[in-house]
Amino acid sequence: MASPEMEERLRKIIVDQLGVEPEQVVPSASFTKDLNADSLDLVELIMSIEEEFGVEISDEEAEKIQTVADALNYLETHQSNE
């Protein structure tokens, strides 16, 4: 399970990148359907996540990240030790 700190860091990135309210950023939220992100938004979001968490997300993996929970699950298993 993702730590509260990880969730908060991810929430801040999503709010900043997509211009949504923090309350909208729930694990089940779809980036495209619920948070109205387009393909460019998603690319920028993935880049911000990579930078913030020190991970490298392949294009193939990025396509699988559809929801906030998907992003958290990816980070849990791939984040480098800080």
UniProtKB/Swiss-Prot annotation:
It comes from the Bacteria. It holds the Pfam family PP-binding. Residues 4-79 form the Carrier domain. Disulfide bonds: none annotated. The keyword Signal does not apply. The modification O-(pantetheine 4'-phosphoryl)serine is found at residue 39. InterPro entries: ACP, ACP-like_sf, PP-bd_ACP, Ppantetheine_attach_site. Pathway: Lipid metabolism; fatty acid biosynthesis. GO terms for cellular component: cytosol; membrane. Keywords: Cytoplasm, Fatty acid biosynthesis, Fatty acid metabolism, Lipid biosynthesis, Lipid metabolism, Phosphopantetheine, Phosphoprotein. GO terms for biological process: lipid A biosynthetic process. The keyword Cell membrane does not apply. It is found in: Cytoplasm. SUPFAM superfamilies: ACP-like. Belongs to the acyl carrier protein (ACP) family. This is Acyl carrier protein. It comes from Chloroflexus aurantiacus (strain ATCC 29366 / DSM 635 / J-10-fl).
